[in-house]
Amino acid sequence: MCKKPYYITTPIYYPSTNLHIGNTYTTVAADAIARFKRLTGHEVMFLTGTDEHGQKIERIANEKGITPKEHVDEIVAGIKDLWKMMNISYDKFIRTTDDYHVKAVQEIFKKLYDQGDIYKDSYEGLYCTPCESFWTETQLVNGNCPDCGRPVEKAKEEAYFFKMSKYADRLIQYIEEHPDFIQPESRKNEMLNNFLRPGLQDLCVSRTSFTWGIPVSFDEKHVIYVWIDALSNYITALGYGQENQELYKKFWPADVHLIGKDILRFHTIYWPIMLMALGLELPKQVFGHGWLLVDGGKMSKSKGNVVDPVVLVNMFGADAVRYYLLREIPFGSDGLFNNEIFIKKVNTDLANDLGNLLSRTIAMVYKYFGGVIQAPTCKEPIDDELINLALSTPGKVEASIDALKIPEALESIWTLISRANKYIDETTPWILAKDEEKKERLGTVLYNLLETLRFVSVMISPFLTETSVKINAQLNTKVTTWESLKEFNGTVAGDKVVKGDVIFPRIDVEEKLAELEALKPAPVKPANEELVENPIKEEITIDDFDKIDLRVVKVLECEPVKKAKKLLKLKVDLGGEERQVISGIAQYYKPEELVGKYVVLVANLKPVKLRGELSQGMILAAAPSDDSELLLVNPGEMLTGSQVR
């Protein structure tokens, strides 16, 4: 029986250049969720695409001597190739240059204008071209864009504006009455306290300083700005504003917009207010995941630390990359991408745990029974723990995915894999094989292992798409439905397993690290379009204390670390960059006492994990020798990011 429709979206990506591992992370996560929902009986619409208009695209195309459309066509082809390589199963790929989208956006703009929510005025301010955002002088950080750190330029032009303030109170009420609308919880507090409650300014929604965009139908010297153009894709892709709205009626409102935290404001303030003005339902949830950090910070061409997913897939395969992104990165928090950790994770989890379980089991079925699966006719109490764990794991996985806890879902599956490996050691099939009278027991043990592998194969299929197919081929099974996991009997006695290649060969860590280092892009000198760095010193140890880099930061959020009485998790503003810091100050400060405070951060300590949480620095504090009290160093309300000398 088909369950209710399920609609999941990624952001539509800006095709100014090729996508990196961070973009891939969002799309792989959405794909895993979409595949899981299909597996469990939902009719799914999984949408991704590209946001193809804007001044930056126009400038890049002019520099290349081609049209903007020629430029985006080239980049979009590469994006689609990447998604094919990563086994992304999107149902629709929308481009904002698609005719149906252009017409629908023009209708949306006109409707908002006709009902008085959009008006014409002029705008003067400081403009960031890469972010396509206007800023006031007071909003700048060190004279640069507060979102990306790049230079801004003065701009004045006639423009249309959307009356954001008209709907602000209504949106605040909606967010408060729908606690799951913005997730994780910390993101909701950020939107309410930093943007909505202080008051909203009306939003500029058209431009006249460039032409690469959707013209306003009744005033064609204006092009419709990114907010209405790009955000509307989530409904225009379903047919909103078109004659056939069957998909819109079936799938809207979206179950989840999956986005990076850097575009949360647009999706949780601009977009819902636009929908309110149109009289449409709001999406059920907007989930803002964290960033993928490389070398302790965000990826940047100027640092030469941008990770190319194509290189990784060509070297290690799509499933290895998918597994690391989905298992190792805490969904909702920042996570570390590190080549050495990645390779070691492939060796331990995929080659050792899963790969060895499969190869050992298939080899024993061939060695002792010529590859023929035996009926489980000689059960013993030791079997029950494995069987009961197998039967209970699908429910745990489903609950984790419903809560968007992807790493926890994979952890549950790997708990079963580990238990199966332990079961081999406990039952010692090689000893049973020496006793002819225990042949029936040996057959039962191997059946239990094969059936456990079948469970594993079904459950990993949304995450490791190619691996699941390979396991099924060696098990010689076609029983791959989610429903089949309700009983531990899907493996058919009398069938014959099939010998196959090792699914994850072990990797020589040093050799592959050297290859990756050789392929690493050289740092690019920052230009106007690149991030202006305020460089942090090299990573240090305590022995290098004289090199320590102290920075002023503002505490944005603070909460206890689970199962760690002494630790607090802080999100701090480093001046255009947010960081997560784990600090052992819980016995001295309550979380609510720290929010809004300015403190000093040791900014160039190597990122580490403490109790499973990423810590990107250390808060400076003073304490007497008996630790009877602890005082945080107070720099006063200096600009965030300022160095302490």
UniProtKB/Swiss-Prot annotation:
Every tRNA-binding domain range: 544-645
Residues at which Zn(2+) binds: C128, C131, C145, C148
GO terms (BP aspect): methionyl-tRNA aminoacylation
One term of GO molecular function: tRNA binding
Motif ('KMSKS' region): 298-302
Cofactor: how and how many bound: Binds 1 zinc ion per subunit.
Family annotation (Pfam families): Anticodon_3 (PF19303), tRNA-synt_1e (PF01406), tRNA-synt_1g (PF09334), tRNA_bind (PF01588)
Keywords, ordered alphabetically: Aminoacyl-tRNA synthetase, ATP-binding, Cytoplasm, Ligase, Metal-binding, Nucleotide-binding, Protein biosynthesis, RNA-binding, tRNA-binding, Zinc
Listed CDD domains: Anticodon_Ia_Met (cd07957), MetRS_core (cd00814), tRNA_bind_EcMetRS_like (cd02800)
EC number: 6.1.1.10
InterPro entries assigned to the protein according to its UniProt record, in alphabetical order: Anticodon_Met, Met-tRNA-synth_bsu_C, Met-tRNA_synth, Met-tRNA_synth_2, Methionyl/Leucyl_tRNA_Synth, MetRS_core, NA-bd_OB-fold, Rossmann-like_a/b/a_fold
Cofactors that this protein relies on: Zn(2+)
Similarity comment: Belongs to the class-I aminoacyl-tRNA synthetase family. MetG type 2A subfamily.
Self-association state and partner proteins as the record states: Homodimer.
Protein name: Methionine--tRNA ligase
Native source species: Clostridium perfringens (strain 13 / Type A)
Gene encoding the protein: metG
